[in-house]
């Protein structure tokens, strides 16, 4: 049989008719296996994550050799991992060291240097003072920032000798045989732009505080739970109380939240290191100070800014107005922790009154401050620990750290604070050790 074209038909030329596959059949044959594989992979990932969460919660993994130890063995002072990594990322005691040989005075932030030859302090003359010397002075105090300095006139009541200085990248030194200060001026030095807030507080009495009034306040949290307050000193460092960390020594479980007056309403920042002052066995309530180093530096903004450290000669007389802030309990017994940052205006209480028989009976030492109100009612409670006691001159300074007290807001037992001026050298040395 031939085709119309005259060519014989060949069975091989005939294309068999195939019934098109319906979409439903294609899905059953191809889609379902793919989905099954994806779901299996997702299930495996979820199971792996759950296993990791459980392991991380109860166990620590030692690297070499691979072993598991219980979380309770972390930071217990014993090397349970062969290579000792279970004791590496722990809260560290930082001992007292020799004092830093530079300081700033409340007299116009003038720079003073310790004369190693005589053991006395001298104000620094502006003659031949350079930006390099300014950076060296600031680095001695633990500041790694661009300093600002200017000349200020020597006043007639200047009570320290005036000296020219020299130095290297490590420290300033009094220049031997330096001439008189020809410029008639001292060095006024600022190592960091600090202590500025966008709003001035106007209300008192434990009321809600806007975040831009206190942009240096942070929440320090352990396993996502607020434990203590703290104060931003610079992009890397947070100042707080040592007792916040006595029970929880694993640094990796601590986080810092900054930039919000609502508890838990800002991203958490990982912590690199925590240093606490070595405790004094004779006075266990002393040395309640700690520094937290962040893994990444803060970016300053209207709601994230540093507070100033006090000047070395800053003295607060009784009745000086100061401020306290925090997310503490609103009542002494049975109250709940505030979700909003609270502020209160208080005043410095005379240490003699604070140590009276109806108060703290001599427990308050020279390294502490008392603050409250004579009638009581405005104070700090649990949860405010580590937060700042603040004083305003031309800028805000953190003069105290919330430390301890009996009750909350009692008229005879005001709050007790770590006196920051007593620990300036400790702060300088800790920061300098990490530069």
From Swiss-Prot:
> Sorted alphabetically, which SUPFAM superfamilies does this protein's record hold?
LDL receptor-like module (SSF57424), SRCR-like (SSF56487), Trypsin-like serine proteases (SSF50494)
Organism in which the protein naturally occurs: Mus musculus (Mouse)
Concerning Gene3D superfamilies, the annotation shows: Low-density Lipoprotein Receptor, SRCR-like domain, Trypsin-like serine proteases
Molecular-function GO terms, alphabetical: serine-type endopeptidase activity; serine-type peptidase activity
State its Enzyme Commission number(s). Answer: 3.4.21.-
Organism superkingdom: Eukaryota
Q: Which gene encodes it?
A: Tmprss4
The alphabetical list of record keywords is:
Cell membrane, Disulfide bond, Glycoprotein, Hydrolase, Membrane, Protease, Secreted, Serine protease, Signal-anchor, Transmembrane, Transmembrane helix
State the name under which the record lists this protein: Transmembrane protease serine 4
């Amino acid at each position: 049989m031939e085709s119309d074209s005259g060519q014989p038909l060949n069975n091989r030329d005939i294309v068999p008719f195939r019934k098109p596959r319906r979409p439903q059949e294609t899905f059953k044959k191809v889609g379902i296996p793919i989905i099954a594989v994806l779901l299996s992979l997702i299930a495996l990932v979820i199971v792996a994550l759950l296993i990791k969460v459980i392991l991380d919660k109860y166990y620590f993994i030692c690297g070499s050799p691979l072993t598991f130890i219980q979380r309770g063995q972390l930071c217990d002072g014993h090397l349970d991992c062969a290579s000792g990594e279970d004791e590496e990322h722990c809260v560290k005691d930082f001992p007292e060291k020799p004092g830093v040989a530079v300081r700033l005075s409340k007299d116009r932030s003038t720079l003073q240097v310790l004369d190693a030859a005589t053991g006395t302090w001298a104000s620094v003359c502006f003659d031949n003072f350079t930006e390099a010397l300014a950076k060296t002075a600031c680095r001695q105090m633990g500041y790694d920032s661009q300093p600002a300095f200017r000349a200020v006139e020597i006043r007639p009541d200047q009570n320290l000798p005036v000296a020219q200085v020299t130095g290297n990248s490590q420290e300033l030194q009094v220049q031997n045989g330096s001439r008189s200060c020809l410029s008639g001026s001292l060095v006024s030095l600022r190592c960091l732009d600090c202590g500025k807030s966008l709003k001035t507080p106007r209300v008192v009495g434990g009321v809600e505080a806007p975040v831009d009034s206190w942009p240096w306040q942070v929440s320090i949290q352990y396993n996502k739970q607020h434990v203590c307050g703290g104060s931003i000193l610079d992009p890397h460092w947070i100042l707080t109380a040592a007792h916040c960390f006595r029970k929880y020594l694993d640094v990796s479980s601590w986080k810092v939240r900054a930039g919000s007056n609502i508890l838990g309403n800002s991203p958490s920042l990982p912590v690199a290191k925590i240093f606490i002052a070595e405790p004094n066995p004779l006075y266990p309530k002393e040395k309640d100070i700690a520094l937290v180093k962040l893994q990444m530096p803060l970016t300053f903004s209207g709601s994230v800014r540093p507070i100033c450290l006090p000047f070395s000669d800053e003295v607060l007389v009784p009745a000086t107005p100061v401020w306290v802030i925090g997310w503490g309990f609103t009542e002494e017994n049975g109250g709940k922790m505030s979700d909003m940052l609270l502020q209160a205006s208080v005043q410095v209480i005379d240490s003699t009154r604070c140590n009276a028989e109806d108060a703290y009976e001599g427990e308050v030492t020279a390294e502490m401050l008392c603050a409250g109100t004579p009638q009581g009612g405005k104070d700090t409670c649990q949860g405010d620990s580590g937060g700042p006691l603040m004083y305003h001159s031309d800028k805000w300074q953190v003069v105290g750290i919330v430390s301890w007290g009996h009750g909350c807001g009692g008229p005879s037992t005001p709050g007790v604070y770590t006196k920051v001026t007593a620990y300036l050298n400790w702060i300088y040395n800790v920061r300098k050790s990490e530069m």
